[in-house]
A protein has these predicted regions:
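Short acidic, S/G/P-rich loop/turn micro-motifs used as interaction or catalytic elements
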Residues: 111-115, 157-160
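A structure-centric signal for secondary-structure junctions around beta-strands
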Residues: 89, 101-103, 147
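Short, flexible beta-strand-to-coil junctions
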Residues: 95-103, 154-158
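Domain-level recognition of nuclease-like catalytic cores that cleave nucleotide substrates
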Residues: 139-201
């Protein structure tokens, strides 16, 4: 049963475990994404923050949230998580409602490297979003088209080596848009630009 965007967004708020996974830190009206990274040449991790202003409504999920032991809980508790493809995930998934459109942004934080594994992380996160969408549809009948894009943020000193001639998308996966932290921090969520949009129906 297709429902309107507001209704589906309300359903996401109701069904997701927001008490554990939702990002609620704000700074001057902007949502704060925060993850520990190792800056170039450093052996000590620091909190890397990206502040994004929001138009419409946003539900920010820290998919890689650590528990009390410093590890991430399995995303699917009924499945063996050891070395399985569903054990991978990106750092953040943002559900963003603007009018009658719901966008989904999968975001991975990296430091001074852009390893091949980040492609697997973002692909696994897309699969998680599809699984979530399917689960809600099967159990409740509620459905709404989602528009998904994938991003990696980094402080790589020379990212051009890994990017297309325009310096935007990964050579290994053209659907993943790259931004430097310094270029995106403080901008609007609407500023995230990716022409490769996956539809989840």
């Amino acid at each position: 049963m297709p429902i309107n965007a507001q209704g589906y967004f309300n359903a996401l708020r109701s069904y997701l475990n927001t008490r554990h996974y939702a990002v609620t830190e704000m700074d001057g009206g902007r949502i704060v994404l925060k993850e520990k990274i190792y800056p170039p040449g450093s052996t000590t991790p620091v909190d890397q923050k990206v502040r994004l202003s929001i138009t419409g409504e946003a539900l920010v999920i820290n998919l890689d949230k650590k528990n009390r032991t410093g590890r991430s809980d399995p995303l699917f508790h009924f499945l063996d998580d050891n070395a399985k493809p569903w054990s991978k995930r990106c750092d953040f998934v943002i559900f963003h409602r603007i009018g009658e459109r719901i966008k989904v942004h999968c975001i991975e934080f990296k430091s001074a490297s852009l390893p091949d594994s980040l492609v697997d992380q973002l692909e696994a996160s897309e699969a998680w979003c599809r699984a979530l969408h399917s689960t809600i549809r099967h159990y409740t009948g509620e459905t709404r088209r989602l528009h998904l894009t994938k991003y990696v943020f980094s402080c790589h000193p020379n990212p051009a080596t890994y990017l297309d001639p325009d310096g935007k998308y990964l050579l290994r996966d053209h659907s993943i848009r790259h931004y430097l932290y310094s270029d995106i921090d403080g901008k609007s969520l609407d500023a995230l630009d990716n022409t490769n949009i996956e539809s989840i129906n």
